[in-house]
Structure formats: C-alpha cells, structure tokens
C-alpha cells in the first residue's frame, strides 16, 4: 500500500521555483531518502506534503487528500525536524509523555507507548534528566522519541543526525531501521550519502527543485560514468609514466601528488589487473595499491554539477 502519493507537486516563491513538478510514492515499511544540495527543495517538499505551505499538485496520505484540517491523517504522522523541539522544564520522560498524550488519551496505553519510545532510542537511564543535562546527541534522540511515541504509521525525519556523536548517530539509524521493520513508512532527508546508502530502500536526488535521479543505491550508482578509482603509493613515478597510464584502457583521469597516484576509470573490466601488469612490465615499484568502487557520493556530485549550491529559500518549520 502506498502511504505517500505525490503527483506533480510544485511550489513557487515569486520568481523562484522551489519544487518543480515532482512525483513519487512511499510504501508501508519503506524508507525513502531525499538527497540534494542545500536549497534543492527537500524541506519545502516535506512542508508541502504536510500542508504546512500552499502548493500545486496532488498529495495523498493513506489514500486521502492531505489538507490542514485532515486531523485523522495527522494523527498517523510523526514529524521530526532538524531543530530540537522539547520543553526545558520537563524531564525526558515527561516530554515524551506530553507529546504522546496529544494523540493517546488512555493513560495505561500511553505509559506503554512512552516506555517503548524510551527503549527504542535507548534513553531509559536518562528518563529523569532535564534537556539541559543532555548532550546534543541525546537531545536528538529525545526529539525522535517525542515524535514517534504515539506509534505513527508515517514518519518524516529531516536531517536527524546533524552534529551528533557517532554513538548517537548509530543509535538513531538503528531506531529508524526498527521503525520501518514495524511497518512505518519513512521519508528521510540527509546530507550524509553513506547514511542514505545504508538505510534507504529507495533514494531520490533533488536539484533545483527537480528530481534528477531516483532508484535503489545500486541503480543510482549505475548512472555514473565513474566505475573505479585506484590509488597507488609510490615515490618513483615519472611524468612520462603518468602519460602512458593516461593512455591505458578505460582511464578517465590521472593525478599524482606527494607520492600518491590516483587513477579514475570509466566503466570496464579488469582495470586493476591491467594496471598491475603495466606496473610490472615497466618495473615500477610501489608500496600500496587499492581499488575503490563508486559511492553514492560520487553519483550525487556528478549529477548535481559537483558543487553544493546554497539558495536563500524560506523554510517553514511549523509543527502539526
């Protein structure tokens, strides 16, 4: 079942088109990653889906047209924005209980939900702490617990791991995976390519408000012309040798700096084998050699013009 159905969604700010006629679906238990440079339209897309801003096109959530007054649909949604939104005067436990109570009236049921949320983000030992006593990573985990305590079937996560410690980051990613395993549909925005690669079932790359690529991580990697990067550590590679390497089959680019030779290949087979044979034939000694396949970051940089553009777009961070 499609939990999110977006068709021909657009949003304009005077002369600027922030979201340009995009369409996509998200199913139950699926994690969709939205990637793009700053100002590419990620946050605007979320705000439009949630009816926090007016837009053109069609948005259906759980098969129903989304609108600001559709409280039945809103009760099934959890939203975790990048900015932490909790009450400083309440403890961790009280904060989660408050936000859960906006949806769950029954006290016994709510208590169970709150404890489940605490366990999900591993904050049990901090339940009586106040927000000011928590690290940045723990605060973000609290923020997530508050957003998902009522067990929503659709969850929006906007850059949830920005500026957190590695332990909290791993915990957050584990929590997101568990939420999807339990059937929640998740729309996840991030700047971290490795997160999207590890976490998301499908990925959409946005640039200038348009979808420029979508698919699984492997499908997106197949779009890049870069097939392989080989790095060689050697202090005795002459310019004439570098010129010969540039003429080898499938070689796209060669750079040599401070004893490190980096060779970028286009698609092709046996690149590493051919290179080693060349080095042996030319009696070139080297200390280390290793190969690296293209990453999602390579795809992202290639498709978006290899620069992260900052636009001045208004970002509306209202809560539901």
Locations of the language-model features?
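ABC transporter nucleotide-binding domain
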Residues: 173-266
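Conserved ABC transporter NBD signature motif
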Residues: 57-68, 73
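Conserved ABC ATPase "signature" region
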Residues: 97, 101, 108-126
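Conserved ABC ATPase signature
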Residues: 89, 130-137
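Catalytic Walker B motif of ABC-type/P-loop ATPase nucleotide-binding domains
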Residues: 155-159
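Walker A (P-loop) phosphate-binding loop of ABC-type ATPase nucleotide-binding domains
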Residues: 37-41
């Amino acid at each position: 079942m499609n939990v999110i159905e977006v068709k021909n969604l657009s949003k304009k700010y005077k002369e600027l088109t922030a979201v340009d006629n995009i369409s996509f679906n998200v199913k139950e238990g699926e994690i969709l990653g939205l990637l793009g440079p700053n100002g590419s339209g990620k946050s605007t897309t979320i705000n439009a889906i949630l009816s926090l801003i007016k837009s053109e096109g069609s948005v259906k959530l759980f098969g129903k047209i989304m609108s600001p007054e559709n409280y039945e649909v809103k009760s099934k949604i959890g939203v975790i924005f990048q900015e932490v939104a909790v009450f400083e005067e309440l403890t961790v436990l009280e904060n989660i209980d408050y936000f859960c109570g906006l949806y769950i009236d029954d006290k016994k049921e709510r208590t169970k939900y709150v404890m489940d949320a605490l366990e999900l983000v591993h904050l049990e030992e901090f339940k009586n702490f106040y927000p000011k006593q928590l690290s940045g990573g723990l605060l973000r985990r609290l923020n997530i617990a508050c957003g998902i305590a009522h067990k929503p079937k659709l969850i929006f996560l906007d850059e949830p791991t920005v500026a957190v410690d590695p332990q909290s980051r791993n915990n957050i990613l584990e929590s997101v995976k568990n939420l999807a395993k339990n059937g929640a549909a998740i729309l996840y925005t991030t700047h971290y390519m490795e997160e999207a690669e590890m976490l998301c079932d499908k990925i959409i790359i946005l640039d200038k408000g348009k979808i420029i690529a979508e698919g699984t991580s492997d499908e997106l990697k197949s779009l890049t012309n870069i097939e392989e990067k080989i790095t060689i550590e050697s202090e005795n590679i002459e310019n004439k040798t570098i010129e010969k390497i540039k003429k080898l089959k499938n070689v796209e680019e060669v750079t040599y700096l401070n004893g490190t030779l980096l060779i970028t290949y286009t698609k092709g087979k046996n690149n590493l084998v051919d290179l080693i044979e060349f080095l042996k034939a030319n009696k070139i000694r080297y200390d280390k050699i290793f190969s690296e396949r293209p990453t999602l970051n390579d795809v992202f940089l290639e498709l978006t013009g290899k620069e992260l553009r900052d636009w001045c777009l208004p970002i509306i961070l209202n809560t539901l």
